[in-house]
């Protein structure tokens, strides 16, 4: 296997503060021109600001990346983790552009004035409120490298890509993707950022906002699922190079981040001088064992540069390689995956090579974690209010007012303190009954449909376990269709849900004839800038949904047009909504519908399925269970997890995830000593891909071998002794030695 290592080296060129400076500092007063409000929150806002005597118009759209259950964690004096209960807003972060400048990007927060960056093609301006100003005055300044000739990287031959790439543009996928990230800030960076929890949190919010702007073209949102601050002491040693630190962090992550949901975790580390700026594993974004990274923050780089470092690490973890500047092109002066992007100002765009890499990544099953949709409604997080019937941070329960709590029988929650009453284990939840936890094994969430699974109370929590479903790609609907995200994707069933039980799925002739017409009413495969898109011959089962009318009744659906067409003696039905209607998606064959052998519909095209050759198969489950969405076996009754091989007649069925299993952890989750793919340490010009023999010299991969050397020496000695004893026994049976001297002489000779 080709093992690849990237090194970002030579950053000593950034040691001095003279390498960058703020120029043309001036005061401006932003003027709000208009805004669009939804449910009390500004979703769109327009500002005018003056820079060097010229007025610029900023068009901003709300960008939500803090989920409702977001938490900031710290540790108390005993080392126990605690919720720091920070007050913050998630609705005041915006992303947009400067009117009249197509290659521009604006990333600002409006929580307390305007704070953020205005990026033009080759220059970046920072804006922040002027402290103690009473007239909404802001400071605006240009950030520019003073000595751009400094080489930041080792002088070595560069070889970033082994495969040729097309130069033409490749459009990314249209559907949204989400990367849920847990960020850890180590002690020295916490001090460097201000030694204040609120200030550091806001800077991390700004960092994630800047990183989100980078991934706009991929329609990816970076969700900051939780933030952890190592205020007084680091939980692991942060010394050593990025490679060693990555292995150390992943080992810690495996033990301590299991209860905090995330797709990927990153440790941010401050260094006065750094030879490397980060490490991650290539293409391992959704692999629970390797979905992590380390980003080093050298003293003199800006938050904008740190965002590029983070974006490059995230890109590498999605299998997006560094650009070969001779083969890869982008509209901007510096592409994102060009290592020089870390030290250039202005807007940066992914190259055509990066877009192709990303398209390959999301077309595979291993990218599935990016499809989880978090809760992203606007909210304002403030101190917990006891008595509002909402359990908030710091509360064990909240049953409402004293009068409301008094109606409960029995009373589990103290209405004055929002703490559990003495003797109570819980106050509410699917697995709470009469103030105590329900016994393990009681069903708390029955399956909804044939692609869902049972969940059970675990006996130690009031909450039902997470909703786990059958693995994508499992056959359903009499083996004609497949499960996708817990639903059986069956066009015939969709026809029934829309038109009624008497309607059947459309005939092959309906799809073949009508979806080939490029007619908005009869059949299309989408709408483009050039008009209606005709379905190509291989995609006709993935365009407009076709159903078969079996009665003489006229169907009427509010706000929809029903189309009837006679094709080969069958009455074909299709549906037409306005494109912006809430139910417009019902017009189309759903993503995941089977359209051929090992093919499914995706974005109105019939493509090779990614739901085959998965890590979990029926054979892994001893043919006595099925695989769930976490690729663990959900075993039949009497057959026990994790692999459905052991038997217990009392077992009702389930998995290690369903709540009713009392066994240990899940075997087969490898540790760091079994790493099969080396980490990427993002590099800069002068860095090449190292082959396997070079990678094997890395410290984290050689220590297990040295631990085994004494074992092999001892084993060899034992084998030699046994062979010699057997040899001597044979001699004792055939020769009669009369003296020790003769014995020694014979022994030396025969040896």
Curated annotation (Swiss-Prot):
**Which biological process, per GO, is one annotated for this protein?**
proteolysis
Q: Where is the signal peptide?
A: 1-16
Extracellular compartment segments = 17-702
Quick one: where is this thing mainly located?
membrane
Q: Which UniProt keywords apply?
A: Cell adhesion, Disulfide bond, EGF-like domain, Glycoprotein, Membrane, Phosphoprotein, Signal, Transmembrane, Transmembrane helix
- For the keyword Membrane, the answer is yes
Membrane topology (Cytoplasmic): 724-751
Q: Which GO terms describe its cellular component?
A: plasma membrane
Looking up PROSITE patterns in the UniProt record yields: ADAM_MEPRO (PS50215), DISINTEGRIN_1 (PS00427), DISINTEGRIN_2 (PS50214), EGF_3 (PS50026)
Question: Could you name the domain of life of the organism this protein comes from?
Answer: Eukaryota
Compartments in which it is found = Membrane
What residue ranges are annotated as transmembrane? Answer: 703-723
Tissue expr: Expressed specifically in testis.
Q: Which residues form the propeptide?
A: 17-173
Describe its PTM?
The signal and the metalloprotease domain are cleaved during the epididymal maturation of the spermatozoa.
What are the disulphide bonds in this sequence?
286-369, 328-353, 330-335, 444-464, 616-627, 621-633, 635-644
One of the entry's Gene Ontology molecular-function terms is: metalloendopeptidase activity
Q: Which residues form the EGF-like domain?
A: 612-645
The annotated topology with respect to the bilayer is: Single-pass type I membrane protein
Q: Which Pfam families match?
A: ADAM_CR, Disintegrin, Pep_M12B_propep, Reprolysin
State the oligomer form and interacting partners. Answer: Heterodimer with ADAM1/fertilin subunit alpha.
Q: What is known of its domains?
A: A tripeptide motif (VGE) within disintegrin-like domain could be involved in the binding to egg integrin receptor and thus could mediate sperm/egg binding.
Q: What is this protein called?
A: Disintegrin and metalloproteinase domain-containing protein 2
Q: Which organism is it from?
A: Oryctolagus cuniculus
- The coding gene here is ADAM2
């Amino acid at each position: 296997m080709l093992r690849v290592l990237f090194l970002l080296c030579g950053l000593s060129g950034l040691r001095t503060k003279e390498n960058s400076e703020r120029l043309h500092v001036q005061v401006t007063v932003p003027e709000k021109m208009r805004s669009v409000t939804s449910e009390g929150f500004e979703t769109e806002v327009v500002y005018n600001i003056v820079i060097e005597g010229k007025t610029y118009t900023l068009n901003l759209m709300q960008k939500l990346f803090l989920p409702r259950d977001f938490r900031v964690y710290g540790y108390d004096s005993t080392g126990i983790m605690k919720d720091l209960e920070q007050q913050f807003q998630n609705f005041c972060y915006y992303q947009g552009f400067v009117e009249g400048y197509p290659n521009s990007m604006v990333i600002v927060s409006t929580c307390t004035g305007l704070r953020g960056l205005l990026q033009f093609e080759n220059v970046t301006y920072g804006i922040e409120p002027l402290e103690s100003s009473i007239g909404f005055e802001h400071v605006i300044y240009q950030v520019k490298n003073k000595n751009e000739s400094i080489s930041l990287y080792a002088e070595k031959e560069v070889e970033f890509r082994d495969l040729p790439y097309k130069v033409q543009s490749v459009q990314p996928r249209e559907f949204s993707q989400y990367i849920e990230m847990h960020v850890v800030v180590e002690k020295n960076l916490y001090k460097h950022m201000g030694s204040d929890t609120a200030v550091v949190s806001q800077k991390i919010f700004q960092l994630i906002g800047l990183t989100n702007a980078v991934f706009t073209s991929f329609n990816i949102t970076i969700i900051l699922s939780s933030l952890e601050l190592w205020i007084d002491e680091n939980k692991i040693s942060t010394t050593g190079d990025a490679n060693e630190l990555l292995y150390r962090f992943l080992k810690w992550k495996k033990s301590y981040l299991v209860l905090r949901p995330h797709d990927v975790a990153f440790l941010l580390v401050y260094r006065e001088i750094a030879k490397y700026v980060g490490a991650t594993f290539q293409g391992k974004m959704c692999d629970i064992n390797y979905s992590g990274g380390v980003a080093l923050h050298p003293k003199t780089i800006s938050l904008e540069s740190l965002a590029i470092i983070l974006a490059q690490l995230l890109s590498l973890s999605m299998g997006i390689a560094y650009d070969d500047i001779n083969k890869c092109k982008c509209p901007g002066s510096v592409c994102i995956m060009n290592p020089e992007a870390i030290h250039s100002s202005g807007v940066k765009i992914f190259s055509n090579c990066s877009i192709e890499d990303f398209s390959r990544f999301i077309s595979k099953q291993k990218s599935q974690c990016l499809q989880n949709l978090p809760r992203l409604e606007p909210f304002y997080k403030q101190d917990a209010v006891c008595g509002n019937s909402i359990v908030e941070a710091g509360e064990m329960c909240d049953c409402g007012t004293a009068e409301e709590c008094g109606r409960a029988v029995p009373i589990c929650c103290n209405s004055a303190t929002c703490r559990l009453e003495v003797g109570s284990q819980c106050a509410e939840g699917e697995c709470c009954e009469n103030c105590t936890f329900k016994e393990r094994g009681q069903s708390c969430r029955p399956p909804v449909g044939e692609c869902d699974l049972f969940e059970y109370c675990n006996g130690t929590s009031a909450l039902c376990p997470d909703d786990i479903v059958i693995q994508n790609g499992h056959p359903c609907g009499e083996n004609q269709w497949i499960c996708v995200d817990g639903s059986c994707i069956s066009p015939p069933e969709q026809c029934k849900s829309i038109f009624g039980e008497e309607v059947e799925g459309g005939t092959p002739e309906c799809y073949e004839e009508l979806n080939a017409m490029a007619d908005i009413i009869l059949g299309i495969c989408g709408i483009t800038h050039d008009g209606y898109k005709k379905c190509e011959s291989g995609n006709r089962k993935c365009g407009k949904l076709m159903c078969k009318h079996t009665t003489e009744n006229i169907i009427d659906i509010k706000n929809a047009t029903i189309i009837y067409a006679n094709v080969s003696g069958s009455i074909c039905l299709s549906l037409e909504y306005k494109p912006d209607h809430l139910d417009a998606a019902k017009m189309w064959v759903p993503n995941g519908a089977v359209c051929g052998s090992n093919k499914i519909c995706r974005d109105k095209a019939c493509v090779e399925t990614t739901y085959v050759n998965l890590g979990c198969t029926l054979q892994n489950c001893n043919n006595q269970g099925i695989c769930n969405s976490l690729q663990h076996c959900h075993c039949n009754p009497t057959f026990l997890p994790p692999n459905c091989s052991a038997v217990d007649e009392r077992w009702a069925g389930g998995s290690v995830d369903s709540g009713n299993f009392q066994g240990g952890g899940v075997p087969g989750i490898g540790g760091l000593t079994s790493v099969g793919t080396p980490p990427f340490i993002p590099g800069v010009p002068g860095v090449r891909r190292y082959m396997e023999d070079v990678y094997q010299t890395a410290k984290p991969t050689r220590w297990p071998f040295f631990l085994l050397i004494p074992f092999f020496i001892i084993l060899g000695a034992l084998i030699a002794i046994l062979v010699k004893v057997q040899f001597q026994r044979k001699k004792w049976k055939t020769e009669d030695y009369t003296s020790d001297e003769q014995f020694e002489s014979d022994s030396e000779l025969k040896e």
